[in-house]
A protein has these predicted regions:
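C-terminal interaction modules
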Residues: 2-9, 17-29, 50-56, 69, ...
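Short N-terminal segments immediately surrounding and downstream of signal-peptide cleavage
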Residues: 24-40
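Short beta-strand segments and strand-loop junctions that repeat across beta-rich extracellular domains
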Residues: 36-52
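Small-residue helix/turn framework positions
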Residues: 130, 136-139
Length: 257
């Protein structure tokens, strides 16, 4: 199954078990199934300024924000089909979470503001269901795969890194028009822009210059792509996972067994 991952403005959602949400037609909830350390939730239905502690078995829905503390981590599930792990100091926003039944996820849109996530997405119907993840630099599309995504916005050089452990992810700096761009597989030729895109940097109103080059990459098993400022590809290719925290690539903890 194809998986759609949107990387362009990612914020993290953490929910408290004691928090109740009123669900409209089709809205579904996710749940916190593992927690080590601190997890905070900012509920869309209450004040947007106050973070509240979230615990194991807390639920969340669209519009919520989740944030892990220092030396903390959490695992979320969505309709028992997909799971998302949050590394320490990660913030995720749940922008949209819609289902057609108790165990049927139809649409999920998440945004990673800062930090790192690992996710395994299952149970989506090709051409019907949508799972998107975005950061401030790019967007990706997914269906039936395992991947990790990190976003670093602090400092002079913002960066988004996508790693695919198995399956296939399509990522673009113009996720709203993926179906119009010519795709290039990582490890092949460099990313291409759409035939209709404007060549080279273009001056626009204001003090800065922007590039209108647009690209779409296909990232497969054990490949990664790093995106820098302006949505430009910094590097792409295979990666060595020996330094990756085993839990952030799908391994179980002793307490999980």
């Amino acid at each position: 199954m194809p998986v759609k991952l949107l990387l362009a403005g990612f914020s993290m959602l953490l929910l408290a078990a004691s928090t109740l949400h009123s669900e409209g037609p089709g809205q579904v909830r996710g749940r916190v199934v593992f927690l080590e350390g601190d997890l905070s939730l900012r509920n869309a239905e209450t004040t947007r300024s106050a973070w509240q502690p979230a615990g194991l078995d807390s639920s969340f829905s669209q519009g919520d924000l989740l944030r892990t503390g220092r030396s903390s981590r959490a695992e979320l599930t969505i309709q028992q089909q997909s799971r998302i792990r949050l590394a320490p100091e990660t913030q995720l926003e749940v922008q949209r979470l819609i289902g057609e039944g108790e165990d049927d996820l139809a649409e999920a849109r998440l945004h990673l503001d800062e930090g790192e996530i690992w996710a395994e997405v299952n149970g989506l119907d090709e051409g019907e269901d949508l799972f998107e993840i975005s950061s401030d630099l790019a967007g990706a599309a997914i269906t039936g795969t395992a991947f990790s995504l990190s976003s670093r916005q602090g400092g002079a050089e913002p960066e988004t890194r996508l790693r695919v452990w198995h399956g296939e992810v399509r990522i673009s700096n113009a996720p709203w028009k993926m179906d119009q761009l010519e795709a290039t597989e990582v490890g092949k030729a460099g990313p291409r822009k759409a035939p209709s895109s404007v060549k080279g940097p273009q001056s626009v109103a204001g003090p800065k210059s922007v590039s209108l080059d647009e690209w779409l990459l296909i990232v497969k098993d054990m490949q990664e792509v790093v995106i820098g400022a302006g949505g430009q590809v910094v590097s792409q290719g295979s990666f060595n996972d020996t330094e990756t925290d085993p839990w952030m690539k799908g391994a179980s903890l002793p307490s999980d067994k």
